[in-house]
Amino acid sequence: VSSYYTMREDLLHSLAANEVNFAVDPFPPSETDIKKEIIFEDEFVCGFRKDHPLASSKNLSIDQYLELDHIHISGRRTGGALVDNALSKLQVERRVILRAQHYLITPELLNNSDMVLTCTKAFAKKHKLAFKTLPFEVAPSQFFLAWHESNDNDPGHIWLKSLIKESFQEAKLK
């Protein structure tokens, strides 16, 4: 088993050519020969260290949220996230002071600063972060498992698909 990053624009070809057996992505290809199912869904929250000044407030207002120092996670050099798209509909912008490629660096950063991270509730709980409900509507975080239909009856493919789905369910429960 190998796991690696594939550019979205190459994903359809890679799945069809069996160069890639599965893709885990929030935006899977929508072609009819690509099967997909949701394997993770969770609400976004504003996460921060337990003794952060926000920890004692009852709710988080949109003005408070926008004034905070945010960490933005993205594998891309530019562009926003679902949260930024929701904020742009309100014609506002959050203050991003750090952009990183992966969530795993954030617990240490958050626990040693006043920065905040918009993340899933599961991530906040797993890393023992305090969190508040976001003060605006945003679609939930979703990850899909996608594969080419030609693999539907392959026993190894079926087995690996069940392991991937199970690991995502366990990750959400922890």
Where do the protein language model's features map onto the residues?
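Beta-alpha-beta core module
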Residues: 32-38, 42-43, 104-152
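Short hydrophobic/charged patches on amphipathic alpha-helices used for structural packing
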Residues: 9-12, 16, 36, 62, ...
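Flexible hinge/capping segments at coil-to-helix
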Residues: 31-70, 154-158
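Short loop/turn segments at beta->alpha junctions
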Residues: 7, 61, 101-102, 120
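Short alpha-helix C-terminal cap/hinge motif
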Residues: 1-4, 12-19, 85-89, 162, ...
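Alpha-to-beta junction loops
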Residues: 15-24, 44, 92, 110-117
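Central regulatory/effector-binding core of bacterial HTH transcription factors
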Residues: 1-31, 99-100
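Secondary-structure junction motif
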Residues: 54-55, 68-90, 153-161, 171
